[in-house]
Design a protein with these regions (language model features):
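The structured alpha-helical core of multi-pass membrane proteins
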Residues: 2-675
């Protein structure tokens, strides 16, 4: 009962409604919803082309597609995975956070699966948009303009992708409301055109029998062998993104919309199959290079509308991966697998976020993919390999969630055995894609995982030396320092930003910075912690003075919609304390204003750790720390995250308090003596 109440509360912020369902259709289903554009095309090409199409092939291949979508998307993700949410957030990192206490080694499948999903997400916009734009060639008037010059297709594709990433900053809610009605029309178009051809050849419904798929997989007429599963898998690559996007739309809205989406998808696949059975012997089709049944089965007058609609749907397909990537990186940052990055919340729901750095990196990656592979056939060959790794990792983590958190005994073992075996077949069948382009996503996944490993290991080394000191024990020293005229006053107010939320304790590095690294004399020291709240508009603070008028522990409680302008908020706190007499007036004689007020100057000190050359650490640890600090510099500066760009900020490096290597004692020589 407690578990069910917890789940219900986590999704209460996004109730099921027509509006939310439209957002769900616009944000979540783009990837899986555009699969009909290229799945049947890949199946036909893999079996030897239109000349090798038989009724056995069509029914067998479609049966494999139908049951791939049913088993992986419907059963594994919609019915099982969506139940495993972390305060409403989905995705492999949210799942790991639920089971990490079950074993430290589970961080490995979490990092591998997350890295593979992010890498595959870079390929998705390229392959879907390129496929849609290539559909223009099925329109004679447009083909006369474009011709067979792939460079023009590439240029149009790049323009669309760049615009897609530029509009991310306005938020997924606004994008979803714009895309939702279009995706509804898209799915109705898929279902309607598919149903039209199913009526013409009702025998295609025999593909719903799973025996047809298994029999064809083992049949000598299956020219692709087990590799046919690699093409079938393309029909469900968007399932993992569906799980990752749960925080944007809520589980209930996915439950409400998936039956409609699945029916339309299956009708489209069966409609293409029915058209193939009716036209397999058509000699005119034999001469069409790179035949795509999705476009070819449509009447010539309907193709311009279909190409235009599929282009927009392809853009929305990219959106599903982009929004999922934002959620994944946000979760990874909380788990200390990636650096902290600047995050914006354009909507009223915390799950809808925008991370500029992730957006820019994915944009560059998509552009590279388009320029490297040029056409959709090459991209399809690379597509899907990495995502099979993600699905296997998700299955493993779900096993521990069901077994350890849900306390189920037998069901988790059956679940893991079945889906790991099934996904293992898909992984083996996709391995042939490695040398045809799959290497790119594997290399990207390896790069992303390398960043995670370095950040995770580097953070582990730092945390081993992390120590909190009782702040009250240092009040006498701070009082003496405040009154010690031998040291020049650094500023009226010296401010440190802290990660820890303890009131009575302080990070040793901060105490070391104030007292040991050239004493930082001030009228008052401020230790400020910023906590982002689940409510969007929370705007409050608390202060602990320790009975002094020179040491202040400030907690800022800011809703996720509130800009973190620490300088401005701290000045308000100072004014409040000055008004109550808890802070003595900080008068100063020089100012551009006629009334300088009673608030003095501020100096913000941001701590950065430094590993000294003589530190006694393992070479692997030294490498991890060094690489972490390189990544940290690339990730941006806290001065920008906390709105301190125009403030007086200094970065101070403090050493990691590790053991130091013993050094030999030097021999002292006389002034004129030489060794």
């Amino acid at each position: 009962m407690e578990q069910k109440a917890k789940e219900a509360a986590s999704h209460a912020a996004i109730p099921v409604s027509i509006s939310a369902m439209l957002v769900t259709l616009g944000v979540v289903y783009g990837d899986i919803g555009t699969s009909p554009m290229y799945v049947t095309k890949a199946l036909v090409a893999g079996n030897g082309g239109i000349g090798s199409v038989t009724e056995e092939f069509v029914l067998g291949a479609l049966s494999l597609v139908v049951w791939t979508v049913t088993l992986l998307t419907t059963i594994k993700y919609v019915l099982i995975s969506l139940r495993a949410d972390n305060h409403g957030e989905g995705g492999i990192f949210a799942l790991y956070s639920l089971v990490k206490r079950c074993g430290k080694w589970l961080i490995i499948p979490a990092m591998l699966g997350g890295a593979a999903l992010l890498a595959d997400g870079i390929l998705t916009p390229a392959v879907t948009v390129t496929t849609a734009i290539e559909g223009l060639r099925t329109i004679p008037a447009v083909h006369a303009v474009l011709g067979d010059d792939q460079g023009r297709v590439v240029a149009i594709t790049l323009a669309i992708i760049i615009v897609l990433f530029l509009v991310q900053r306005i938020g997924t809610a606004k994008i979803g409301h714009a895309f939702g009605p279009i995706m509804t029309l898209w799915f109705l178009f898929l279902g309607g055109t598919g149903l039209f051809f199913v009526f013409q050849h009702p025998a295609v419904l025999l593909c719903l029998n799973p025996v047809r798929g298994i029999a064809f997989l083992l049949s000598p007429n299956n020219h692709a062998g087990i590799m046919i599963l690699g093409s079938c898998f393309l029909a469900t690559t968007g399932a993992e993104a569906l799980y990752s996007d749960m925080g944007h739309v809520g589980r209930g809205n996915i439950y409400a919309t998936w039956p409609f989406v699945k029916c339309c998808l299956l009708l489209s696949y069966m409609g293409q199959g029915a058209w193939l059975m009716n036209n397999a012997a058509n000699p005119e089709l034999m001469g069409i290079a790179d035949l795509n049944p999705f476009y070819q089965m449509l009447a010539p007058g309907l193709r311009p509308f279909a190409v235009g609609l599929s282009t927009v749907a392809a853009i929305i397909a990219s959106q599903a991966l982009v929004t999922g990537a934002f959620s994944l990186v946000s979760e990874a940052s909380r788990l200390d697998l990636m650096p902290h990055m600047q995050v914006f919340y354009p909507a009223e729901t915390k799950g809808q976020l925008y991370i500029p750095m992730v957006n820019n990196v994915m944009l560059v990656g998509c552009v590279i993919v388009v320029l490297l592979f040029q056409n959709s056939a090459h991209m399809e060959a690379a597509y899907g390999l990495a995502i099979t790794l993600t699905m296997m990792c998700t299955t493993l983590l779900l096993f521990f969630y069901l077994h350890e958190e849900r306390k189920l005994k037998v069901a988790p073992w059956i679940f893991a055995a079945f889906f790991l075996l099934l996904e293992g077949f898909f992984f083996v069948s996709s391995l042939t894609k490695f040398f045809h382009g799959g290497y790119f996503t594997i290399l990207m996944a390896a790069l992303i995982m390398g960043i995670m490993v370095c950040w995770y290991n580097g953070t582990a080394v730092e945390q081993r030396q992390f120590t909190l000191l009782p702040l009250r024990s240092y009040l006498p020293q701070l009082k003496r320092l405040r009154d010690d005229d031998r040291y020049e006053r650094m500023s009226d107010n010296v401010v440190y930003l802290t990660k820890d939320t303890h009131t009575d304790y302080i990070d040793r590095d901060i105490v070391y910075s104030i007292l040991d690294k050239h004493p930082k004399r001030a009228r008052a020291w401020w230790f400020v912690n910023v906590e982002t709240m689940d409510e969007p508009h929370t705007f409050a603070y608390s202060v602990e003075t320790f009975g002094t008028d020179y040491v202040f522990r400030v907690h800022l409680y800011l809703g996720y919609k509130i800009n973190q302008r620490v300088n401005a908020y701290l000045r308000q706190v100072v004014q409040d304390l000055a008004a109550t007499g808890e802070l003595p007036p900080q008068t100063h004689d020089y100012s551009v204003y006629k009334d300088p007020g009673n608030i003095g100057t501020f100096k913000f000190v941001l701590i950065r750790k430094l590993l000294a050359p003589e530190s006694d650490v393992e070479p692997s640890e030294r490498t991890a720390i060094t690489l972490k600090y390189i990544i940290r510099r690339a990730a941006g500066t806290p001065a920008r995250w906390y709105g301190l760009e125009n403030s007086n900020v200094s970065f101070e490096y403090v050493p990691l308090f590790t053991k130091f290597k013993a050094v030999n004692k030097m021999q002292r020589l006389a002034p004129n003596e030489r060794p």
